[in-house]
Design a protein with these regions (language model features):
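Mg2+/Mn2+-dependent nuclease catalytic core
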Residues: 158-188, 332-437
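Short amphipathic alpha-helical face segments that pack within enzyme cores
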Residues: 28, 32, 253, 257, ...
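Structural motif
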Residues: 17-29, 226, 244-255, 379-383
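N-terminal intrinsically disordered, low-complexity, charge/repeat-rich segments that act as generic
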Residues: 52-64, 71-91, 99-102, 106-109, ...
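Amphipathic alpha-helical interface elements
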Residues: 1-122
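Charged, glycine-rich intrinsically disordered N-terminal tails and low-complexity linkers that flank
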Residues: 142-145, 168-170, 174-293
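A non-catalytic, helix-rich entry segment at domain boundaries
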Residues: 261-337, 483-523
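Accessory interdomain/linker segments of ATP-dependent helicases and helicase-like nucleic-acid enzymes
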Residues: 113-159, 453-567
Length: 568
């Protein structure tokens, strides 16, 4: 440890002696030094904190830094963010101020005096920082670090500004954020939160509409929506889907072929030949078609290809007729197929089937059945499909700045066909994000504890008595819904003690790997995981070879049927 302290002082001394042209490089070296120091003092902990702000808060609590000392470190963090993102020009005055902050931090960590040569270069006055005054305003998004809570408030520290004391966040407020009551019971110290649509009163108290736990851990929208089942929407549904094999590949295969049909009709200038489309489907999905057990039965095979023709005709009718009908006004010549979205604000990712280029309208296509029984004589969208549409509307608002009230969202059930307009419900979106938070908390707990007993306890929740939140009974529940849930527990209970231990250990390992692949790993220098896309600065991406920029497309052959390619 003594060598670490001496090496750290030597780095600071070299930075302070560098000339004016090296200020940005100096900030990069000091930033890397702070990252290493925080990781060094978190090495024995299992906390999965990939954000520097959270690491500073953790180490500060561990070594007993005062609020003023913490704020000086956060001031350096924010200044280095701005400089490394090319939003601010570095000055020697600020560099020496921040070098002094790091020097005193090193002294605290290693209990080793600052060398005289370095001390003489540091400013005599204490490092100062600016505390943003509270204002009566509305903030769209704030990233904060959770510290503790009481019956009325969550106490958090902001990541993008400096505060003398934790900010207060009002929670469980009726008609505003009461949907996140369960989320707030699951928080742990230093957890990262995104607060969305935040009202700030004159006392500086925050009242957010959304509370998103660990937003760097992205959950797939379709997987989250599938948690909404006929019998309830418990978080364990997410883990049940992950652990269940696909028993019937036929609906999935039909959906893929229907997407191919949509692609053909959108890009077609005239009529599309059905047989040529099916030949293309066979070329694209040869193994899936050959391996599908249902298609080995002659009657089911005939029904499958009859369904393909039905969906083909319905998609043609929708694209050629319904698109141009009054009230829809969809233009296939100005559309994007299968655009993908990453929404750090909500901790979600997903892919749409069809979207107008100006994002004014989008379509999510379903080849399965809608709800034919909720209202007699009327076809209604299923709850999981409505949830999926709501989440896409929320993603467009918080990622692309599109007001959800101005975006037309449609569900296309190609079986009927039915192009159903989706109506936004922000209270429902809040409930779904609360469910997402509970899933993330479960994932975090499993990878943090890495305990066979804890994992066994969590997987024990995957049973009919827990998942059947609506208390269904009768023939439909017993014949069609319950067996798939019971089947998992029966298989688990049939394992020997050794087999169970192996399964739980492997499950823990995969969960840990999945968590680090998304949020990153504190054991490595630099940023890792998918979250580095928005957490890393441009300079960090360039240095690690993760980005090539200033490229121009010379020839675009991406839509070519054979050997699609781009020339840059």
């Amino acid at each position: 440890m003594e060598n670490k302290g001496r090496e750290s002082y030597e780095i600071l001394l070299a930075v302070c002696k560098a000339d004016h042209l090296q200020l940005t490089i100096g900030y990069k070296q000091m930033r890397d030094l702070l990252e290493r120091l925080c990781r060094l003092h978190m090495h024995n902990g299992s906390l999965q904190m990939t954000d520097l702000s959270a690491r500073i808060s953790f180490v500060a609590a561990k070594v007993g830094l005062s609020v003023a000392e913490q704020n000086r470190l956060h001031t350096f963090r924010l200044t280095s963010n701005a400089i490394l993102n090319r939003q601010q020009e570095p000055t020697r005055e600020h560099l020496l101020r921040d070098a002094k902050t790091l020097a005193f931090f090193i002294r605290k960590l290693f209990e080793e005096d600052i060398p005289q040569e370095l001390y003489r270069l540091l400013p005599r006055t204490d490092a100062t920082y600016i505390v943003a005054p509270p204002a009566h305003k509305q903030v769209q998004r704030m990233r904060v670090c959770f510290q503790y809570s009481d019956e009325r408030y969550l106490y958090v520290t902001p990541l993008d500004e400096i505060a003398d004391e934790p900010l207060r966040v009002r929670y469980n407020i009726p008609q505003i954020n009461e949907e996140f009551a369960e989320t707030c019971q699951l928080l742990w110290r230093h957890a990262q939160l995104n607060l969305l649509d935040v009202a700030v009163d004159e006392a500086g108290t925050l009242t957010p509409s959304f509370i998103v736990l660990e937003p760097d851990y992205l959950i797939d929208i379709s997987s989250l929506a599938e948690c909404y089942r006929d019998y309830g929407h418990h978080p364990a549904n997410y883990f049940l889907s992950r652990l269940q094999p696909i028993e019937n590949a036929r609906p999935l295969l039909l959906g893929n072929i229907a997407n191919l049909f949509l692609d053909e009709w959108i890009h077609a200038e005239g009529e599309v030949d059905y047989l040529k489309c099916m030949q293309k489907a066979f070329r694209r999905y040869p193994i899936e078609l050959a391996a599908c057990a249902d298609l080995r039965d002659r009657e089911k095979e005939r029904q499958f290809f009859d369904d393909c023709k039905l969906h083909f005709d319905h998609i043609r009718e929708t694209v050629n007729d319904t698109f141009h009908a009054a009230g829809y006004e969809l233009d296939k010549t100005d559309a994007v197929l299968e655009p993908s979205y990453i929404c750090e604000a909500l901790g979600l990712q997903g892919r749409l089937d069809y979207m107008q280029r100006d994002m004014s309208s989008f379509i999510e296509m379903k080849s399965g059945k809608a709800d034919e029984y909720a209202i007699r004589g009327k076809v209604e969208p299923k709850e999981n499909n409505k949830v999926q549409m709501l989440l896409y509307q929320a993603v467009l608002q918080y990622s692309m700045g599109m007001d959800h009230r101005k975006v037309k969202a449609y569900l296309l059930y190609t079986r009927y066909p039915l192009l159903y307009p989706s109506r936004p419900s922000w209270a429902m979106v809040r409930r779904v994000i609360d469910l997402r938070n509970r899933i993330v908390a479960d994932e975090y707990g499993i990878q943090l504890r890495n305990s066979l007993e804890y994992t066994a306890q969590k997987l024990e929740e995957i049973k009919a008595s827990v998942l059947n939140e609506r208390g269904l009974s009768g023939r439909f529940w017993e014949t069609y819904l319950r067996p798939s849930i019971d089947n998992f527990q029966e298989k688990l209970k049939s394992l020997s003690t050794l087999e169970k231990s192996y399964f739980y250990a492997l499950y823990n390992f995969i969960t840990k790997e999945l968590y680090t692949s998304k949020s990153g790993d504190v054991d490595y220098e630099g940023r890792t995981g998918a979250a580095s896309l928005w957490l890393s600065t441009l300079a960090e991406k360039c240095e690690s070879g993760e980005i090539i920029y200033d490229l121009r497309i010379k020839e675009n052959h991406a839509a070519d049927e054979h050997k699609s390619h781009l020339l840059l």
